[in-house]
Amino acid sequence: MMIPLQKLLQFYKWNDTHIDIGKCQELKEKGFLQIKEHSKYPLYILNYTSKTQLKQKWCKELIHARGLVVAEDGEIIARSMPKFFNHYEIRGELQEQDYELYKKLDGSLAIMFHYKGNRIFCTRGSFLSDQALRAEQIFKKNYIDEDVNKECTYCFEVIYPQNKIVVDYGDVEDLFLLSIIHTKTGKNVTM
C-alpha cells in the first residue's frame, strides 16, 4: 500500500514539545506502538512496531516513534530521526530541493541525550540494549561530554566488531555522528 506524499509531509512538520499519551496508549493497545520504561528514571522510549510497517498505519506519533523518549506527562525528552520510507512506499513526486548526501554505515542507531544532568544512551527501542551500553562505553572512552549541547539529541551509528550486521569493519569501534536534533524544536542542527 502506497502512502500519499502530501499526507506524510504533514506528519514530518512536528515541533510539539509533548506527545499525546492517550493516543500513544491507544496505539500500543492496537499493536502499533511499543513503549518501554527506563529502569532508573521516569522516562519511556517509543518505537513503532513491525505491524505498523506491515499495515502502513502511519500518523505523526508513529512516524516520530523511532527512539522517541518521553516523560510521564508526554514531554519530549529526546528525538531521534523520524521513520524514513523506501521509494515504493510513497505515492507522489518529491519537489527538487537542496540536500546533503552521507555515506550509509552498517551499524546500529544509538541515541544520546541528557536528562537531569545525566547523559543517557538508548537505541530505537531500548535503554539497556548491548548497542546502547556499548555506545555509552565508546563515548566515555573517546569523547568529552562538555563538547555537546545538552539541549540537543545526538544520533550516532555505533559500530563495533561484535555488532556486525552485514559489513565487516574489522576492529573498528566508534560512534559516527548522523544528526543533531534540537530536542524542543525538532529542528536539525547543522553539523
Locations of regions flagged by a protein language model:
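Core nucleotide-handling region used for phosphoryl-transfer chemistry
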Residues: 1-191
